[in-house]
Curated annotation (Swiss-Prot):
This is Probable 2-(5''-triphosphoribosyl)-3'-dephosphocoenzyme-A synthase. It catalyses: 3'-dephospho-CoA + ATP = 2'-(5''-triphospho-alpha-D-ribosyl)-3'-dephospho-CoA + adenine. The keyword Secreted does not apply. NCBIfam families: citrate_citG, PRK10096.1. Disulfide bonds: none annotated. GO terms for molecular function: ATP binding; triphosphoribosyl-dephospho-CoA synthase activity. Its EC number is 2.4.2.52. Pfam families: CitG (PF01874). PANTHER family: 2-(5''-TRIPHOSPHORIBOSYL)-3'-DEPHOSPHOCOENZYME-A SYNTHASE, TRIPHOSPHORIBOSYL-DEPHOSPHO-COA SYNTHASE. Belongs to the CitG/MdcB family. InterPro entries: CitG, TriPribosyl-deP-CoA_syn_CitG. GO terms for biological process: prosthetic group biosynthetic process. It comes from Shigella flexneri. Keywords: ATP-binding, Nucleotide-binding, Transferase.
Length: 292
């Protein structure tokens, strides 16, 4: 797990501080997957709309990824004097190596590929901010991550070629920018919506699990989730957004009784083979940023 050659200087950050942030990332991944019931997603109750993965796969995956999060932080610190647009290139080898360990831990199952991208970006942003003695807050972390991704959507989604990736196809057909667009914009769905919503519910004394489930509904209602669109097309995405919005308008998830609505929503997502994995990734970021 050596550092890429594009690092420019040695980090001065304490190992204990780096490991603390990595632990927060691991906790965020575990919190999300253990949260139940989640419509269409793997949780403690069932495997959602997934036939190829189980809860234990996510637990093994999160542990494997935790070991790499310090590398993202260290690279963010070592590259602090580089132009932010140049950082992403150096992060890619770390992300690919982390992805390899994830696949080895899960016997080939893609459990957290989206989170490797998003958590990797945020961890690198934290490393850069710490190295530059700048405040580490949800806003500064996300804006720094955005600076790493400047031009990413243009470079990777608007390219015309005969062999379109799934992301390019969804962008051309539906205008969805997915994880790339959200990162380049500085995670506005998290910073402007999910995180303040979650923290407000906690301040009101709501049970943390209920608060997270309600926040997941908010993300599902507002996120142009490419995971959903790739499975169910535009119709599937719009249906899921409407259902989530309807539950929010009815009062959301405030009591254990409200979980019955989520269980029904889960059954319907499974029947339609829809899994809001993109919203789950954003919920992980919400959990992570709420801790820093």
């Amino acid at each position: 797990m050596s550092m890429p050659a594009t690092s420019t200087k040695t980090t001065k950050l304490a190992t204990s501080l780096i490991d603390e942030y990595a632990l927060l990332g691991w906790r965020a991944m575990l919190t999300e997957v253990n949260l139940s019931p989640k419509p269409g997603l793997v949780d403690r109750i069932n495997c959602g709309a997934h036939k190829d993965m189980a809860l234990e796969d996510f637990h093994r995956s999160a542990l494997a990824i935790q070991g790499w999060l310090p590398r993202f932080i260290e690279f963010g610190a070592c590259s602090a004097e580089m132009a932010p647009e140049a950082v992403l290139h150096g992060l890619r080898p770390i992300g690919m190596a982390c992805e390899g360990d994830m696949f080895r831990a899960t016997a080939g199952v893609n459990t957290h590929k989206g989170s490797i991208f998003s958590l990797g970006l945020l961890c690198a942003a934290i490393g850069r901010l710490l190295q530059l003695n700048q405040p580490v807050t949800p806003t500064t972390v996300c804006s720094t991550a955005a600076s790493f991704c400047r031009g990413l959507t243009d470079r990777e989604l608007r390219t015309n070629n005969s062999r379109l990736t799934a992301g390019q196809r969804l962008y051309q057909q539906l205008g969805l920018t997915g994880a790339r667009g959200e990162a380049e914009a500085g995670y506005p769905l998290v910073i402007n919506h999910a995180l303040p919503h979650y923290l407000t519910l906690l301040d009101q004394g709501l049970d943390p699990e209920l608060a997270l489930l309600d926040t997941l509904l908010l993300l599902m209602a507002t996120n142009g989730d490419t995971n959903v669109a790739s499975r169910g097309g535009e119709g599937g995405l719009r249906w899921l957004q409407r259902e989530a919005q309807t539950l929010l308008q009815k009062g959301g998830i405030r009591t254990p009784t409200d979980l019955d609505y989520l269980r029904q929503f889960d059954r319907e997502c499974i029947e339609r083979n829809l899994s809001p994995g993109g919203s789950a990734d954003l919920l992980i970021l919400t959990c992570f940023l709420a801790q820093i």
